[in-house]
Amino acid sequence: MAKFTPANLPAEFLDTMRDIMPSSLSMDDFIAACQRPLRRSIRVNTLKISVEAFLRLVQPYGWQLEPIPWCQEGFWLLNAEEENTRLGNTLEHLSGLFYIQEASSMLPVSALFHRNEALETVLDVAAAPGSKTTQIAARLDNKGAIVANEYSASRVKVLHANISRCGVSNTAMTHFDGRVFGAALPEYFDAILLDAPCSGEGVVRKDPAAMSHWSPESITEIAATQRDLILSAFHALKPGGVMIYSTCTLNKQENQQVCHWLQAQFPDACEFESLRDLFTDAERATTEDGFLHVFPQIYDSEGFFVARLRKTASVPPLPRPGYKVGKFPFSPVAPKDCVPLIQAARKQGIHWDETLLQLWQRDSEIWLFPAALASAFGNIKFSRIGIKLAERFPKGFRWQHEAVVALADPNANNAYALTDDIACEWFQGKDCYPEPLPTADELILTYQNTPVGLAKRINSRIKNSLPRDLVRDGASSAQQLAKE
């Protein structure tokens, strides 16, 4: 593993931190925390495996796991060390059983569902690489719908890959500047997560170069963008809805001041809700307004800021956008065609709740769209909605990998459980020669009781059909990694 090089903290930045740091905290402790490597942390993906089953699974691996107090699915991995750079290639990760996610970044979603908030439609304004989107999907248990937006074109592909790997079925993706949503979908969402682009002062333990372009002038520019984003998000939020505003930075200009600015625009419609009781010991990071201002030395984590805001009344709408969305390219599958399609899918071991996911088509493509988003179709351009289920051919259907990962029954008659060695070959893109041979010709392949793909048996060979962009030459089991 590469040697950790502490960040060079500018004197002006340290002066700013000294001015805003609570008297209960020490600057010496702050500097010491910033110059320590960040603890590796993971989140169990409960769409694939329960926390209890995951802990039983990894118990033989010798992982030293410490629970993260604000996320019951989250754990610090205390003895990561050399395997830090290889956790992403473990079978357990490639199968979607866990997500490598910094502990502080689990806070916003925990705050979103604080007091067991019941949510139907959620917007994740800046979603890539997908840690929070997949965390929201798990908390929703794939019910309702999420719009996962990402402005950066280079990060959209990564976002989709993580959504697919984790078996998320209730998400639609958009590729916009987040400032469009308030006008395009006014007062539409039950909840919004705005993890805003920021100066990144809190991430120096993970990325020492994060401070290389730090300046007061850049913070002023970023804060102006953040005000635009939070204003648009507030307009897109239903009356009674909740918004989480978060950053991975520490200065007040990008944090408290942005929230107070929004409240000043809508004094009769915007309330702050305290996060003091979000988890045991949360009061150590709680401000007078009930925000969480997490300096890195408090919980030995990244620096972070989280605010929870409630929209208490409707607000005057923004002007409608001038652009044209264009004709929606999909149409619902006719009821008479749904029955044989559903029967064919079930025969293959693929099941879904027809009240949550609805069949749509485009040419020969069959898709499953979240029913909760139907009213948004045609009002905004989506880059991808739900799950591509199949392609229709004269002799039947070609079922898609992402549908199998999200919807297949690991206990179906045609399911075949892979050993560690065979699973490694599968994720390395190789054909497999298992013993004993499976009896079915079309197989749902599983690993640790979760579906990882669909394959054909040809004589004694399982033909590898894993999409090429998912192939990992270094795929290995976590147990094998622990032995090395």
Curated annotation (Swiss-Prot):
Compartmental location: Cytoplasm
Question: Catalyzes what?
Answer: cytidine(1407) in 16S rRNA + S-adenosyl-L-methionine = 5-methylcytidine(1407) in 16S rRNA + S-adenosyl-L-homocysteine + H(+)
Q: Which SUPFAM superfamilies match?
A: S-adenosyl-L-methionine-dependent methyltransferases
Q: Which InterPro entries match?
A: Methyltr_RsmF_N (IPR031341), MeTrfase_RsmB-F_NOP2_cat (IPR049560), MeTrfase_RsmB-F_NOP2_dom (IPR001678), Nol1_Nop2_Fmu_2 (IPR027391), Nop2p (IPR011023), RCMT (IPR023267), rRNA_ssu_MeTfrase_F (IPR023545), RsmB/NOL1/NOP2-like_CS (IPR018314)
Natural source organism: Pectobacterium carotovorum subsp. carotovorum (strain PC1)
Kindly provide the name given to this protein in its UniProt entry: Ribosomal RNA small subunit methyltransferase F
| BP-aspect Gene Ontology terms | rRNA base methylation
- What Gene3D superfamilies has UniProt attached to this entry? 3.10.450.720, Vaccinia Virus protein VP39
- EC number from the UniProt entry: 2.1.1.178
